[in-house]
Amino acid sequence: MAELACFCYPHLESDTYRFIPFNSLAIKCMLTAKVDKKDQDKFYNSIIYGIAPPPQFKKRYNTNDNSRGMNYETPMFNKVAVLICEALNSIKVTQSDVASVLSKVISVRHLENLVLRRENHQDVLFHSKELLLRSVLIAIGHSKEIETTATAEGGEVVFQNAAFTMWKLTYLEHRLMPILDQNFIEYKITVNEDKPISESHVRELIAELRWQYNKFAVITHGKGHYRVVKYSSVANHADRVYATFKSNNKNGNVIEFNLLDQRIIWQNWYAFTSSMKQGNTLEICKKLLFQKMKRESNPFKGLSTDRKMDEVSQIGI
């Protein structure tokens, strides 16, 4: 995760702003600079290589002292920064909006995946600039649209029906902020269209999840799509979701947290996110993740008869 201000800076032109991507040498200068505390939140002028991000975001970049940040010296950083600028320059951002826009915390890996989709000649985003920019505006939280299958970050499609598409995420192969844990495995489920979904299509998805992904929890980050994650990683997801939710509220970026379909979401996660939305502390919310829940009446009782036992998945074992 990183703020948009880690990728670009605003330049006032008439009554609107044009966004310009940072270059890696300017960032490198900023990372080595001694800056007064009162100037930590201001864009840094490297003198030689142009404007750099505010020093308060130093920890967002990979250095000798911090291996958890972005690999900003890779070509992928520039591609992501340029893509963000293209999207922001396609809309009007005024002086009253610019601080709010740049403070938004975004998924770096999501943006890298959109770059990969853009470069894939077989992908619809390669052929449609309008759809590409829509996808980016959704990814950076500037659009009220939800991420659907056409505008999704992408990955490897492992399941699809008339209503849903399930993707295996490819973060292990990333350049900008790769997942280093070689045991990482995670999926994302997007709706094909933002419209009511028939019960039969929900049934098909739940049957697939029960049999092929029975070692995983179905959760949501509140953005209109589902994530299918290992139970061992749920607490980590909870920390990130809670931090992003609080950060957005603090910065005035109030975005409705979409709880999604309770029949699909893991019961404990639904309780966690509901508690978070009510304003409870992280400690109180996380207790619900490990609490034994009263099993609710199953609207799809009998689904287990839809598959033979030899079809039960070994994924995640």
Curated annotation (Swiss-Prot):
Pfam families assigned: Rota_NS35_C, Rota_NS35_N
GO CC annotations, alphabetized: host cell cytoplasm
Keyword Magnesium applies: yes
Subcellular location per the Swiss-Prot or TrEMBL entry: Host cytoplasm
Positions contributing to ATP binding: S107, V108, R109, K188, H221, G222, K223, R227
Cofactors required: Mg(2+)
Function: Participates in replication and packaging of the viral genome. Plays a crucial role, together with NSP5, in the formation of virus factories (viroplasms), which are large inclusions in the host cytoplasm where replication intermediates are assembled and viral RNA replication takes place. Displays ssRNA binding, NTPase, RNA triphosphatase (RTPase) and ATP-independent helix-unwinding activities. The unwinding activity may prepare and organize plus-strand RNAs for packaging and replication by removing interfering secondary structures.
The keyword Metal-binding is annotated on this UniProt entry: yes
Domain of life (superkingdom): Viruses
Identification of the protein by name: Non-structural protein 2
Recorded GO MF terms: ATP binding; metal ion binding; nucleoside diphosphate kinase activity; ribonucleoside triphosphate phosphatase activity; RNA binding
Species annotation: Rotavirus A (strain RVA/Cow/France/RF/1975/G6P6[1]) (RV-A)
UniProt similarity note: Belongs to the rotavirus NSP2 family.
EC numbers: 3.6.4.-
Species classification: Viruses, Riboviria, Orthornavirae, Duplornaviricota, Resentoviricetes
Region (RNA-binding): 205-241
Location of the active site: H225
Subunit structure: Homooctamer. Interacts with VP1; this interaction is weak. Interacts with NSP5; this interaction leads to up-regulation of NSP5 phosphorylation and formation of viral factories. Interacts with host DCP1A, DCP1B, DDX6, EDC4 and EIF2S1/eIF2-alpha; these interactions are probably part of the sequestration of some host SGs and PBs proteins in viral factories.
Stored InterPro entries: Rota_NS35_C, Rota_NS35_N, Rotavirus_NSP2, Rotavirus_NSP2_C, Rotavirus_NSP2_N
